[in-house]
Amino acid sequence: MQPVLSAEQREIMRCACRSERELAIMDLLYSSGGRVSEICQLNIADMDFINRRARIYGKGRKEREIYFSAQASLHIRDYLKTRTDDNPALLVGVKTPCRRLTIAGIQWILKNIQNRDERLRGLKISPHTFRRSCGTDMLNRGAPVEMVKEKLGHAKADTTLQCYAKISTEAVRDAERRFGAA
């Protein structure tokens, strides 16, 4: 089973962020559950901050919506206020001319954030770790598999269960208390 980040590890990473852009990237990756390729393709015009959703093009160029948290919305809007360029991309590099961030660029940013706190050293953290953490956390909180499947843009619920259902010991214990035969 691939690793997921605990709430504490995500908070440690958030505290290690040094810019609104870094916070926006982390919060958007986790709260939306979007693929890093989908996040990189986002334009500012795709964002609906009132309803906290964005239009993306997923695998197979299928259009769908992703939803993001109020926290992500706040950090994205604060990040956009710091920008002085006219690039339509949501996430851009800091060097002029500001170009759309790539998958490798986001990986590099996350690795730098991770390296700022020794408690995160040795963990395998990638953009996909945030997606996996989002799906796993939703399942652990009792979200129906079908809902998680839709959020993550999976074609089949089997994919969701196989890749994201790392159920915590506490969740198993709670389920046994609530639904067990005892």
Residue ranges and their predicted role:
Residues 1-182:
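Conserved catalytic core of the tyrosine transesterase superfamily
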